Curated annotation (Swiss-Prot):
Gene name as annotated: cmk
Species assigned in the record: Salmonella paratyphi B (strain ATCC BAA-1250 / SPB7)
Binding positions (ATP): 12-20
Enzyme nomenclature, EC number: 2.7.4.25
Protein name in UniProt: Cytidylate kinase
Molecular function via GO: ATP binding; CMP kinase activity; dCMP kinase activity
Keyword rRNA-binding: no
Length: 227
């Protein structure tokens, strides 16, 4: 019997540093990477490319079931590959964001994408980045990490990120938006944002990204008995 490939799940709120951590771990371990947050955008873009009706659940389900998508991390940069083409920039447009909201509303589409995400589990292993990876998508994962940080620290990081890209931002407004999203995510009826019972909760508020990566890799290697 073939052994099931191991999964390391990295869950947590927006701005905690999940993306950076997952890319670093995927590169360090040479494992596959799943960015679950991009999945709905990728499906929406595929639907737009193939002129699939965004209001038709029946048309979207087969597209979701056979979505040809890969995530490749190179030198800390994540490439989203749809049908052999790098669409990392294209999935960030407002048109795609709006379409993603539409397709995510269909229960059968969500079920199809859940199965599609689980299909990323291949040897030698998978790093799964999301919000319910350890609780819903891969509840049997041998290594689960919940990466958190204070809302103030996450707002500060987001502000610096936006300023570096030339945007003028208001810290108090950013903080209010993050707190509102946290409340919505942590208290929703379906798949609330909570650590899995067997997850390592890692607070990155006062840690550098290098320290976070070091702690996470050390924990994963111990759990998986990796060299």
């Amino acid at each position: 019997m073939t052994a099931i490939a191991p999964v390391i799940t990295i869950d947590g709120p927006s701005g905690a540093g999940k993306g950076t951590l997952c890319k670093a771990m995927a590169e360090a371990l040479q494992w596959h990477l799943l960015d679950s947050g991009a999945i709905y955008r990728v499906l929406a873009l595929a639907a737009l490319h193939h002129h699939v009706d965004l209001a038709s659940e029946d048309a979207l389900v087969p597209l979701a079931s056979h979505l040809d998508v890969r995530f490749v991390s190179t030198d800390g940069n994540l490439e989203v590959i749809l049908e052999g083409e790098d669409v990392s920039g294209e999935i960030r447009t407002q048109e795609v964001a709006n379409a993603a909201s539409q397709v995510a509303a269909f229960p059968r589409v969500r079920e199809a994408l859940l199965r599609r995400q689980r299909a990323f589990r291949e040897a030698p292993g998978l790093i799964a980045d999301g919000r319910d990876m350890g609780t819903v998508v891969f509840p049997d994962a041998p290594v689960k990490i919940f990466l958190d940080a204070s809302s103030e620290e996450r707002a500060h990081r987001r502000m610096l990120q936006l300023q570096e890209n030339g945007f003028s931002v208001n810290f108090e407004r950013l903080l209010a938006e993050i707190k509102e999203r946290d409340d919505r995510d942590r208290n929703r009826a379906v798949a609330p944002l909570v650590p899995a019972a067997d997850a390592l909760v890692l607070d990155s508020t006062r840690l550098s990204i290098e320290q976070v990566i070091e702690k996470a890799l050390q924990y994963a290697r111990q759990k998986l008995a990796l060299a």
